């Protein structure tokens, strides 16, 4: 600490965050989506909503300075923190000293999420630039039962969107296929240092592991169907390599208009189409 910053200040206070960055010669890296939380109420709300509790295995992606990490560990969770930025090694060695936290250094997009123990909960302030790919990996990892994450408000809206709504797309469909989405709260720009360009939201996704996992072939079909969500479903499927006549017959059999837009089609109807087109048996 500098002489001007009393040690009684919480780690998430702007003064402590600036002090850490200054002493370690660091500047937040925009390319890594580094915006550090400086609001204790929001930190506690994320940990609470995520279910951090004694003995619960928790994965945090992008611990940054260790602010949320400490809150999770303080609640007794067994925390694994996955960090890519090697510059933060001395920072986390300082801020997580004495904490029950395992820090894994590496790229979150290359981590083996299937290796996580059953009952794992993801609780994280996700790097915004890889939010979609990370959420898809969480959904498909059998050991992860929930993900409570801080994301761009626009992404939160897409996750909860239903067919027919303006922001419905493949990410919305994925979330519905694997479980449910709950909006926890919005987070203003001023809760971060540095402040991001957009408003954020905390959402919780619960994954129903008792439900059979979607077939890989069906996931690819849904992705192709929603690739250009405002175009007609017929055009999207033709672009994906399905014959126009076969698509027309499948749409008719499913009771769908030939000009129906992809974003308006429920997953149940897409499954019917997938069967009609030989994607599923």
Curated annotation (Swiss-Prot):
Family to which the UniProt record says this protein belongs: Belongs to the class I-like SAM-binding methyltransferase superfamily. rRNA adenine N(6)-methyltransferase family. RsmA subfamily.
Alphabetized Pfam families for the sequence: RrnaAD (PF00398)
Gene: rsmA
Function: Specifically dimethylates two adjacent adenosines (A1518 and A1519) in the loop of a conserved hairpin near the 3'-end of 16S rRNA in the 30S particle. May play a critical role in biogenesis of 30S subunits.
Enzyme Commission number(s) from the entry: 2.1.1.182
Residues binding S-adenosyl-L-methionine, per UniProt: 35, 37, 62, 83, 107, 125
Subcellular locations according to the entry: Cytoplasm
One Gene Ontology MF term: 16S rRNA (adenine(1518)-N(6)/adenine(1519)-N(6))-dimethyltransferase activity
SMART domains xref list: rADc
Domain of life: Bacteria
Keyword annotations of the record: Cytoplasm, Methyltransferase, RNA-binding, rRNA processing, S-adenosyl-L-methionine, Transferase
One GO cellular component term noted in the UniProt record for this chain: cytosol
Organism the protein comes from: Deinococcus geothermalis (strain DSM 11300 / CIP 105573 / AG-3a)
Name the UniProt record assigns to this protein: Ribosomal RNA small subunit methyltransferase A
């Amino acid at each position: 600490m500098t002489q001007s910053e009393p040690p009684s200040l919480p780690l998430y206070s702007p003064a402590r965050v600036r002090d850490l960055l200054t002493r370690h010669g660091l500047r937040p890296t925009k390319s890594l989506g580094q915006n550090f939380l400086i609001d204790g109420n929001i930190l506690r709300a994320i940990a609470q909503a995520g279910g951090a509790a004694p003995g619960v295995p928790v994965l945090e992606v992008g611990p940054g300075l260790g602010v949320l990490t400490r809150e999770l560990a303080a609640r007794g969770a067994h925390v694994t923190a996955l960090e890519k930025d090697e510059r933060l090694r001395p920072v986390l060695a300082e801020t997580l000293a004495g904490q029950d936290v395992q820090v894994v250094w590496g790229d979150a997009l290359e981590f083996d999420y299937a290796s996580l123990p059953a009952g794992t909960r993801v609780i994280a302030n996700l790097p915004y630039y890889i939010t979609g790919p990370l959420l898809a990996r969480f959904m498909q990892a059998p050991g992860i039962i929930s993900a409570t994450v801080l994301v761009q408000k626009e992404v939160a809206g897409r996750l909860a969107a239903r067919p027919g709504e303006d922001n419905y797309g493949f990410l919305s469909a994925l979330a519905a296929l694997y479980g449910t989405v709950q909006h926890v709260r919005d987070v203003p720009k001023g809760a971060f240092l540095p402040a991001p360009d957009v408003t954020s939201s905390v959402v919780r996704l619960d994954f129903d592991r008792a439900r059979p996992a979607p077939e890989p072939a069906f996931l690819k079909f849904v992705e192709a169907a929603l690739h250009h969500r405002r175009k007609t479903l017929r055009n999207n499927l033709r672009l994906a390599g399905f014959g126009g006549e076969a698509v027309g017959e499948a749409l008719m059999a499913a009771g769908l208009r030939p000009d129906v837009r992809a974003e308006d089609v429920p997953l149940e109807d897409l499954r019917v189409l997938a069967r009609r087109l030989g994607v599923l048996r």
